[in-house]
């Protein structure tokens, strides 16, 4: 194992892992390092994890992935302190898009209405609906509202955006649009 201090605020740990270790094992180790730094030394830490490599010549690539993981995490998952490149998913793709393309996508999706026209309660409802896998009953229970109230809110969103969030394809488009909006808010002038 090697530790390198590359700047005043950045340190790199190169960890040898056994073949049977996986990314989850690395995330657990990283979380324990973060806990130690914060608990014992009062140092705020965020850890990015690159993909495991089999050859030392790929070290730079894995390091770059760890940096990207932290950058993407700052935009899409600000609460997490350990971010693995392998688990960035669609956020990694969105992060690499030019802002002009993202802005065009939002205009296409929301046509005359802006995503900004959705109030905080509506966005909270949508977020909970997504977290409950588009399940109306579970979401209404979690929000402590009547099922019909949730259906009414979803219908209101459909009228406003043209997207029926109970439809999987529409829900994906809306989820990506929310992520694109978050990305644009964090990176207003890329490309």
Q: For each predicted feature, which ranges?
A:
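Cytosolic nucleotide-utilizing catalytic cores of signal-transduction proteins
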Residues: 1-191
